[in-house]
Amino acid sequence: MRPSGTAGAALLALLAALCPASRALEEKKVCQGTSNKLTQLGTFEDHFLSLQRMFNNCEVVLGNLEITYVQRNYDLSFLKTIQEVAGYVLIALNTVERIPLENLQIIRGNMYYENSYALAVLSNYDANKTGLKELPMRNLQEILHGAVRFSNNPALCNVESIQWRDIVSSEFLSNMSMDFQNHLGSCQKCDPSCPNGSCWGAGEENCQKLTKIICAQQCSGRCRGKSPSDCCHNQCAAGCTGPRESDCLVCRKFRDEATCKDTCPPLMLYNPTTYQMDVNPEGKYSFGATCVKKCPRNYVVTDHGSCVRACGADSYEMEEDGVRKCKKCEGPCRKVCNGIGIGEFKDTLSINATNIKHFKNCTSISGDLHILPVAFRGDSFTHTPPLDPQELDILKTVKEITGFLLIQAWPENRTDLHAFENLEIIRGRTKQHGQFSLAVVSLNITSLGLRSLKEISDGDVIISGNKNLCYANTINWKKLFGTSSQKTKIISNRGENSCKATGQVCHALCSPEGCWGPEPRDCVSCQNVSRGRECVDKCNVLEGEPREFVENSECIQCHPECLPQVMNITCTGRGPDNCIQCAHYIDGPHCVKTCPAGVMGENNTLVWKYADAGHVCHLCHPNCTYGCTGPGLEGCARNGPKIPSIATGMVGALLLLLVVALGIGLFMRRRHIVRKRTLRRLLQERELVEPLTPSGEAPNQALLRILKETEFKKIKVLGSGAFGTVYKGLWIPEGEKVKIPVAIKELREATSPKANKEILDEAYVMASVDNPHVCRLLGICLTSTVQLITQLMPFGCLLDYVREHKDNIGSQYLLNWCVQIAKGMNYLEDRRLVHRDLAARNVLVKTPQHVKITDFGLAKLLGAEEKEYHAEGGKVPIKWMALESILHRIYTHQSDVWSYGVTVWELMTFGSKPYDGIPASEISSILEKGERLPQPPICTIDVYMIMVKCWMIDADSRPKFRELIIEFSKMARDPQRYLVIQGDERMHLPSPTDSNFYRALMDEEDMDDVVDADEYLIPQQGFFSSPSTSRTPLLSSLSATSNNSTVACIDRNGLQSCPIKEDSFLQRYSSDPTGALTEDSIDDTFLPVPEYINQSVPKRPAGSVQNPVYHNQPLNPAPSRDPHYQDPHSTAVGNPEYLNTVQPTCVNSTFDSPAHWAQKGSHQISLDNPDYQQDFFPKEAKPNGIFKGSTAENAEYLRVAPQSSEFIGA
């Protein structure tokens, strides 16, 4: 039988209606997104591969879409699949001609770029003004939040024709920033069919699709045409295919299967029959912008119906019916802390002034608690102050001790153990002397006061030698014990007769089971009834406030909705349904404060009730939409409040949780698949030896140059010490006619294996870094005595340099140095390297305009999963260290920020000593009290506030090095505004440049072929005519990547040249080496491509401070600091800060090598080093009490000593 035409049409309509739903239910591939902004990840190739891995086949970006540093001819076709971005879209610093975001429909703008923009397209061009030409985002129809910015895109076509008011919300139009500078005549015009000439590119397919400004007045949001019947549902975003909420292209708020909704279905509904809230079988949890029936794994459920990663501070996590839920805590939430002798208290004898703060809010102690006499006396050996008796109140939250409680000292003015009044159970899993779980010995208390103690699970009790203690013999201890074998030992306390004579007996309301003190609240149990913890004579059943009922000899308060009765009972039990009479209204069997109004009921209907004259709640008429004041339609309220929508902030937070969850899930799944395939392949090849455990950490591809001893020449001894000797010398690469001034560090013949290991570790760190502002290792010679070869630095360390030239240093130099040091430290942070010893003495001066960070003797490389380094001992620079490093030996990149702040202070005070006159042993205490280094006289408050931020106690509150670069770079552009130096504009520093300088420095005559090490390792094109014949040459990629631009330019002499690195000898004497070249610097004829990450190239007016450019100035004939080079034990700095020495804190070095600092500044861990103290206290003592070794009064570097021991046995 053939179906009729009507039935066939109905079937087709049904199928058409189901198609959008099926499409909406499809699972789209999501990706995490990035938050790098303008940071480049390695080389251009590495950066592009990272971009491709992140967004390949991605349809929904949960974070931000950042397309940066993409070079010409790279294929970006993988971006075509992206349809939705939750954060912002950033397209910047690209030279590729086309970025195909053809299917991008919506940008939600949950996160902004520069606090304003959801779409930013910036500086997409190269030196030839060519670059991004096509941006075909033809399906982009809505930006929910945020404005749009276009700037410096000289080759971009057609975008200026877009009607942004159709895409961007009207509230953000005022923040739009449109700077279109397209002067190219090669752009194709929009297709004539495009509305109002608006298009994203040539061709009819690139015409802008209008879904807002063309809508009829009846439409409240988007539309698909000009007719009133073409309006989209108000829950739709970016357009629609029909009028229903299931026809949306994208949901504006939440997606519940195929339907867009304002909120997810609630978990609970009001039941008008039972007058209770019942579980909604259709209820769902909100997870990001999606409604889900079940929260993803590792998420917990809140009472509000949301999937969250962790419970709030006032709730705890528990499992109920197979679901992990957050439940409100009754009182303080449970917090488990380690006891004495465990974890962070492993070597601690007693609770004291320094560790009691760690027990704040603890409810359970995992281990034991000791309170010994040393706690209240203090310990001068460990610099522990006496414990303030008021701080014992911190222990009032403790309810459980899994080990034992030992108290041998207590404040004289306290009559009981008040700090343990809430202690409920002592489990006795560990015991003092293997016997006692509770020991109270030799105290001045009159009562125990352990009024909450209900159980001592194991172990005996000893209460002895308390001359004023009463009440202890009244306790029925057997009732508290968990086993029959437990015993008590209560001796040598105050006699029972003496206690009775002074009235120190249990209260009359206490039962014969005894008491913990004289008050009614101290009773073990009550004679009559109890109210809370206190025994009372009777309950407030017939009179008194609040009214109560009796349950198990306990007074229980009636519900607040029960009306108190006169000489009659008010309630018969707990809850609002056991009241004799209601105080306000009656809703079924329950007493309520107000009748239900707008409560969600069955079938998603709202329940409204009104109260009659008898205060009984009745249902409103079904047609009353906004409540009522009486029965029938005439009682309906005309206007009512609208249901509040979910806050935008909650949506953003849930989306962020979704990003994190999906990102982790995708990462774990991908890693599992790769590992499984690898194991399968190896098993098939029958070559599997052991399971593979790839770490995922990037390989260290640094190059280590091995030199022959014949390739370098030692000229002069710089100094010697316990580890070896440092020489000035020349490196003459084999087969090349160049001479490179170097420093050579040679170990002694009898050097220990430990010293060899330390110098090789230092070489590993130096070889792993390559930055203009970080010292580099030139090579290593593996002779019988290991030799390190590093670059020779002409001007020594920055500390001595600022001291010697303090009358000639202007604000420009000081701020430039701050920028360069921050750049070097930011590079080390990117390489996961913690320096641990940043100071002005460890910064070397290559030229007055160029400084480098050195001394990696204490530096540590963090692993892929490490965020901090825990030191085990050794020498440390106390006055430069962060507080957490001093107290806990924790070193992070943020502890380096603290040291950076001290280094800046040294520069701004022209080499003053930090905390001068204060012993190093007192530094931690004055820092904890809030004292910091004073404001230098030349610094404005702007500069000083940056230093103060570096010295915040909370490490996360300190600025990042990348932020410090931005701040000091801004100041370096206007130096006299931030530093006030008299005669600043006339100050300049000598800067010799020719080979005469090296000739004088090296005492050599034949220095015509001298070449700086940086120029040799990364030479300019055509610099050397003959190739190197060394057997260990640098890879060609080093020189190939030294310049990112291939565009030719003409220098001032008319010779062909290329853009130069900021530490190049061609730019050595620029007035501001920290900044980029400007267009004015080469007569506006050429703008070089930035060589470094985030190098800005804006054109700005010249500052008022001008630094001279030096050319061939004569060398100073007799440098004043030359004797320091000859004498490593010079006493140039008076009143030395370091122990057992008169050596200076910094000797003028001439090369960027940690080896030289180890010799001159003594930063290696050796016995003859004044700057680093191995142990502040000696480990042994002679029988006469005199310590072996030297003592310290003002050590800059010290090590935490073990605590003293004091213990009195029971």
From Swiss-Prot:
Transmembrane segments: 646-668
Chain positions found as Omega-N-methylarginine: 1199
Extracellular side: 25-645
Sequence positions that bind ATP: 718-726, 745, 790-791, 855
Matches recorded under Gene3D superfamilies: Hormone Receptor, Insulin-like Growth Factor Receptor 1, Chain A, domain 2, Immunoglobulin FC, subunit C, Phosphorylase Kinase, domain 1, Receptor L-domain, Transferase(Phosphotransferase) domain 1
Approximate repeat residues: 75-300, 390-600
Top-level taxon: Eukaryota
Entry EC no(s): 2.7.10.1
Residue numbers bearing the Phosphothreonine modification: 678, 693, 1041
Disulfide bond sites: 31-58, 157-187, 190-199, 194-207, 215-223, 219-231, 232-240, 236-248, 251-260, 264-291, 295-307, 311-326, 329-333, 337-362, 470-499, 506-515, 510-523, 526-535, 539-555, 558-571, 562-579, 582-591, 595-617, 620-628, 624-636
Modified residues (Phosphotyrosine): 869, 998, 1016, 1069, 1092, 1110, 1172, 1197
UniProt topological domain (Cytoplasmic) ranges: 669-1210
Gene Ontology MF: a single term: transmembrane receptor protein tyrosine kinase activity
Protein name according to UniProt: Epidermal growth factor receptor
Biological source species: Macaca mulatta (Rhesus macaque)
